[in-house]
């Protein structure tokens, strides 16, 4: 984990007594505009979750990651600098038809960060970003506006679950 939480980034709220975050939050997913994945063949076990703001998300749950040798949050929990081969292949294949973003976040005990990898035209659209606001940046790339919400993260509802696997139940 790399940096303290910026409370405006749609992450867990601080404990009222200590001011620190006591709840863990982790997310690994691929996001795109609504309908983009409808023509994309999904690997077995993956499914599309409709979010607010015309965004669809494919949560990369634990069983899928283990089956395809994709580590837990390789950029925010590890020192990864490139996408694992199976994940890179999926992003390249799908992005030939539409823009998408791989997003990840990991926070615990008041610290953590986010990462994104943007794809379009079958290739990376920019360098990998690891920062406190990486997911919001990726969502803006996909055309999400925060509207009345605190930020883009909250606007599409990524604050509904605190763990990737919860999106699949």
Describe each PLM feature range.
Residues 10, 53-55, 60-169:
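Charged interaction segments
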Residues 2-52, 169:
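Short, extreme N-terminal segment that most often corresponds to the first beta-strand
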